[in-house]
């Protein structure tokens, strides 16, 4: 296009003889050549994109989808790269074995601690942090060890499927011999007020590349963006080790709502100013320009980006309730709050991870006469 413009400008400028028909033909020739070049570039980029997608599917044991994607391409029968990768998928698929669902374990974490000096500073929260939290360094070591031992991330939705009539059927997880499927989750990804200043991330955000990262407030009050908690840490690990994820699975985030979600103050109390706890009052006093609707919009964008990358959300009850001890009516009221103020941001969910591990039933399972069920 630049060359075409220069030639056209030369004709219009005059100063010498330049036959119009020759100028037109030259302009058309250069334009056509440019279009052909653009077309080749587009084709090359498209081919690379397809190969990248199919290769990732191959690395994450999703062989059927990789083959399907490759064979959908018009030039599949003449593209050696496509055919070779499809053949590799067929061979790998033939070696898969079904993993016993009853042997799948669940590993969960709370918010990770980055600055141990601030978390374990001897105040009243230090003991609890030490008992139930994990540091960033510990998490990285745990995940590396699990990867080295052959663990692979799966979802509960791989273990069971919901039929059209509402009944459930067993899923089937097919992995290479020696791989060990497991489910990973993180509780309370709300970045509660009580954790402020204790060396943990403050929220999840989208960086300049649209990737999900953490906002982190340093000890001196400056703000950094990076991998300071489980979500971006695991995202980065899986980019480097794609075979740690089965079919692109990540983890499940068990969400409350009373302090908002993902570090955004999205509960309705922050908008109405009603029934505020002391830490919520302090937040609003410290942030007089707080925009509730903007926080809801920002949280929704982050949640959408996370779901697109394989993350899933579960209810942890809106108020972190002990489902064993609380009445069915309390749980119903709590669930309505979750549906009203959390689901519009995160989306609906068919999973609950009980706060405190407090179930609504016992070892014998649920029954229809259980009002909580």
Specify the residue positions occupied by each region the protein language model found.
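Solvent-exposed, polar/charged alpha-helical surfaces in well-ordered, non-transmembrane soluble domains
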Residues: 52, 56, 64, 68-71, ...
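Substrate-binding cleft/loops of secretory-pathway carbohydrate-active enzymes
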Residues: 361-373
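N-terminal, intrinsically disordered, polar/charged segments of Gram-positive cell-envelope systems
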Residues: 21-95, 102
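Metal-dependent polysaccharide deacetylase catalytic core of the NodB/CE4 family, i.e.
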Residues: 102, 107-117, 167-168, 175-182, ...
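Sec-dependent N-terminal signal peptides of Gram-positive bacterial secreted proteins and lipoproteins
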Residues: 1-23
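N-terminal pre-catalytic segment of deacetylase/amide-hydrolase enzymes
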Residues: 32, 84-182, 191-211
């Amino acid at each position: 296009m630049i060359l075409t413009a220069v030639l056209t400008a030369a004709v219009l400028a005059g100063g010498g003889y330049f036959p119009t028909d020759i100028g037109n033909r030259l302009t058309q020739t250069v334009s056509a050549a440019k279009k052909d070049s653009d077309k080749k570039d587009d084709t090359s980029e498209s081919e690379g994109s397809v190969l990248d997608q199919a290769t990732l599917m191959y690395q994450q044991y999703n062989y059927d989808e990789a083959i399907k994607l490759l064979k959908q391409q018009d030039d599949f029968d003449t593209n050696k790269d496509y055919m070779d990768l499809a053949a590799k998928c067929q061979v790998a698929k033939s070696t898969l074995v079904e993993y016993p669902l009853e042997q799948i374990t669940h590993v969960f974490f709370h918010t990770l601690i980055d600055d141990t000096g601030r978390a374990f500073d001897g105040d009243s929260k230090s003991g609890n942090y030490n008992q139930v939290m994990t540091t960033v360094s510990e998490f990285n070591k745990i995940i590396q060890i699990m990867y080295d031992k052959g663990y692979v991330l799966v979802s509960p939705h791989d273990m069971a499927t919901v039929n059209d009539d509402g009944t459930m059927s067993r899923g089937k997880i097919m992995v290479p011999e020696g791989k060990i499927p497991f489910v990973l989750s993180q509780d309370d990804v709300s970045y509660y007020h009580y954790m402020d200043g204790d060396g943990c991330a403050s929220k999840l955000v989208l960086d300049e590349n649209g990737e999900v990262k953490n906002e982190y407030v340093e000890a001196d009050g400056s703000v950094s963006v990076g991998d300071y908690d489980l979500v971006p840490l695991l995202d980065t690990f899986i980019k480097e080790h794609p075979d740690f994820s089965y079919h692109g699975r990540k983890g499940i985030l068990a969400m409350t709502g009373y302090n908002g979600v993902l570090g955004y103050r999205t509960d309705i109390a922050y908008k109405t100013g009603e029934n505020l706890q002391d830490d919520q009052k302090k937040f609003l006093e410290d942030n007089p320009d707080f925009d509730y609707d903007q926080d809801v919009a920002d949280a929704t964008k982050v949640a959408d980006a996370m779901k697109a990358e394989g993350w899933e959300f579960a209810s942890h009850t809106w108020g972190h309730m002990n489902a064993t001890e609380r009445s069915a009516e309390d749980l119903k009221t709590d669930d309505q709050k979750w549906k009203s103020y959390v689901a519009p941001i995160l989306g609906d969910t068919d999973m609950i991870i009980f706060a405190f591990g407090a179930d609504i039933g016992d070892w014998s399972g649920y029954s229809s006469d259980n009002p909580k069920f």
